[in-house]
């Protein structure tokens, strides 16, 4: 599927490759590995992908023993993966680089060598947890990757023109007309329900089956819960309690996240690390109140008053109806026709 971040990769290849490695970081399952490999296939003569989530010790040992002998390192990597490497025409991808921080530290020497280009991918939560024993290379350029936006969703649905029409009418301050507006809102409601996680979008584009889409989204939510337990060491219970409370807080009129809903007399300082972790992992978007809305928003940020959103609207839908096991086709259809009150009634009755 077409992703806007691809153009940023091309710009890096033209302007920064050879002087920096590119690190794509973001939440799990947003499509980092996919776009990295598609970029490599289209823009390079050859590429070598090392998935540190799956690779064995025999490959990891190469980075431990041959950083002072890069000729031998490249020879072994080329032979192990059966990929011929061409100087200045090949890309080496470190996928899930957070699983082996020593490879990330090696970027300094690999970029200085200059023979090949380097692209790293990793989930933000893990990368920041696994840097304490390495020197973070200054030769990295960071870009963040998010779930698919509305325009990318339209592309996946085979509609390449609607967003251009919306944009032009908006810039001209003119109405789209009832027919086009109705069509745009229909697509937009589909996007809000399905969300922007690539696997869910692809399934919906192919099958239009909400049950299958919901199963995919629930698998991602399960993965996020496992990550919380594994990586939010020391305050995982607080992270999980905030995560579970997000749908209920957003259902309220003001949508402000009240820590008292988690524990009576709860204080912000008790949950500050947990909120930061969710935001840092890009599982949630934390929105703080600004007491003086101007250019310097951070200068007037009230950290005690906040709203907590999910990083993806489709995941929010599945998360909100979590106790039902699966969101039924009936609920999805009511959401599609903007009947949220009917959905709430059906949910409470069940």
Feature-to-residue mapping (PLM):
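Pre-Walker A adenine-sensing motif
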Residues: 3-16
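Hydrophobic anchor at the beta1->P-loop junction of P-loop NTPases
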Residues: 24
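Conserved lysine of the Walker
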Residues: 32
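Hydrophobic positions on the alpha1 helix immediately C-terminal to the Walker A/P-loop
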Residues: 35
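Short glycine-rich substrate-engagement loop in P-loop NTPases that contacts/grips substrate
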Residues: 58-81
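Structural recognition of the conserved hydrophobic beta-strand(s) that form the central parallel beta-sheet
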Residues: 117-123
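Interdomain motor-coupling "hinge/lid" segment immediately C-terminal to the ATP-binding subdomain
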Residues: 131-248
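Accessory nucleic acid-recognition modules appended to NTPase machines
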Residues: 206, 210-349
């Amino acid at each position: 599927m077409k992703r806007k971040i691809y153009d940023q990769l091309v710009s890096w290849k033209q302007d920064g490759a050879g002087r920096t490695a590119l690190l794509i970081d973001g939440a799990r399952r947003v499509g980092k590995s996919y776009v990295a490999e598609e970029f490599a296939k289209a823009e390079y003569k050859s590429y070598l992908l090392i998935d540190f989530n799956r690779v064995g010790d025999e490959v990891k040992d190469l980075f431990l023993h041959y950083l002072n002998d890069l000729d031998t390192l490249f020879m072994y990597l080329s032979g192990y993966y059966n990929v011929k490497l061409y100087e200045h025409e090949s890309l080496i991808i470190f996928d899930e680089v957070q699983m082996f921080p020593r490879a990330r530290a090696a970027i300094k020497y690999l970029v200085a060598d200059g023979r090949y280009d380097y692209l790293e991918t990793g989930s933000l939560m893990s990368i920041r947890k696994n840097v304490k024993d390495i020197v973070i290379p200054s030769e990295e350029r960071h870009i963040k990757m998010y779930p698919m936006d509305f325009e990318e969703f339209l592309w996946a649905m085979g509609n390449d023109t609607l967003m251009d029409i919306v944009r032009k009418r908006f810039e001209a301050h003119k109405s789209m007309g009832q027919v086009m507006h109705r069509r745009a809102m229909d697509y937009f409601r589909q996007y809000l329900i399905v969300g922007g996680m690539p696997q869910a979008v692809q399934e919906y584009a192919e099958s239009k089956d909400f049950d299958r889409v919901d199963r995919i989204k629930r698998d991602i939510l399960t993965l996020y819960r496992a990550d919380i337990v594994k990586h939010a060491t020391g305050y995982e219970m607080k992270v999980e309690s905030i995560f579970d409370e997000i749908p209920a807080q957003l259902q309220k009129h003001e949508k402000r996240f009240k820590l008292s809903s988690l524990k009576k007399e709860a204080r912000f300082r008790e949950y500050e690390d947990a909120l930061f972790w969710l935001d840092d992992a890009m599982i949630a978007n934390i929105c703080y109140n600004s007491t003086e809305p101007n250019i310097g928003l951070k200068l007037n940020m009230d950290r005690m008053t906040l709203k907590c959103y999910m990083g993806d609207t489709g995941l929010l839908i599945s998360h909100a109806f979590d106790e039902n096991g699966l969101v039924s086709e009936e609920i999805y259809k009511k959401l599609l026709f903007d009947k949220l009150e009917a959905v709430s009634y059906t949910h409470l009755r069940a």
